[in-house]
Amino acid sequence: AGQHWLMTLRLRPVHGQLNDGGFDSQRYALAQHRPLSGGIVAASALDARCSLRARYLTSLTRRLQTYPWRAVMLGLGMGERLSLPTEIKVLMQNTGTSHLMAISGLHIALAASLIMLLLRGVQYILPGRWIGWRLPLLAGLAGAVGYAWLTGMQPPALRTCLGLAVCCALRLSGQRWTACQVWLCCLGAILVADPLAVLSQSLWLSAFAVAGLIFWFQWLPLPAGRWRWPWKTIIALVHLQAGVTLLLLPLQLLLFHGVSLTSMAANLLAVPLVTLLAVPLILTAMLVHLSGPEIVESLLWLAADRVLAVLFWGLRRLPDGWLTLDARWLWISSLPWLLVMGWRFQSWRHSP
């Protein structure tokens, strides 16, 4: 990657097969800004030097040769999913955890948060006039953009950076916006910057998930209780995952023609392990790989590898939960939305 080539190409517009229920390759290609397909007739290298990202990726690949879960670590850290074994891809698809392998909001927001917390911690030793919230906020945004570039600036990563930039601008403006207004502003900014994103399934999955969570926490919030840690954290995680699982059913059925019956259990295991352990360890190891002690880097990679081993051990113990459904189930899958609204309005008290 990063090389410059002079090529003679034979190109044609990309097209799909138009099979009902099949994968729409034309829509996917246009969403990825690849409207043409074809073959190479002749090629000659103008500049054979690889980009900085490609050299860093090559160095990481050599460093991880001895770890069993190196392909997953490269996928989580750099967004490289081509080397993932087919078995792992099928397992994550059947358990509804494929979203964890995409460099999107989860990873980039986590990287930005780590940079913000690091800079905020450094401010404790600085004079009072140098302490403020704006510098860590902007540093987190810059770190998010840098990490997105390092992972290849894929469309989901680019959309996340645009959303973070909008949120930072709103925060710096000092105005108070509701969650729905922020959601609409971020979605509008993404579509203005990339109109072809309207064809992307990943955009609508992300947007629908965020809208569903806003709806879930506003219409069916977790009741205040006297739970203590760790039960309070566990109940909050179950409440969050239940909302995502139930409210995304209509869109999953519409896009993928099926649902995963084990997705909630799988995500209850996978999301904490990946978010709180695997990804922070991988990001720290990637940073230490640049100049840190080799023994520290080895320990970080080993810890991340063992966390992933535990994760996939648990996922393999789950039954095959993928259930193929047709469009007749679409209205039934919308019942969670209707039930939440009915509960909120207490409509049974007013019904005859």
Where are these regions (language model features)?
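Membrane-interface helix/helix-cap signal primarily in integral membrane proteins
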Residues: 1-99
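Hydrophobic alpha-helical transmembrane segments in multi-pass membrane proteins
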Residues: 38, 88-264, 329-352
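C-terminal regulatory/interaction regions
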Residues: 295-352
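Membrane-interacting alpha-helical segments
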Residues: 53, 57, 61, 231, ...
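Hydrophobic alpha-helical transmembrane segments
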Residues: 46, 50-51, 79-87, 151-157, ...
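N-terminal secretory/membrane-targeting helices
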Residues: 1-4, 40-48, 52, 76, ...
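Hydrophobic alpha-helical segments of membrane proteins
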Residues: 67, 72, 157, 241-257, ...
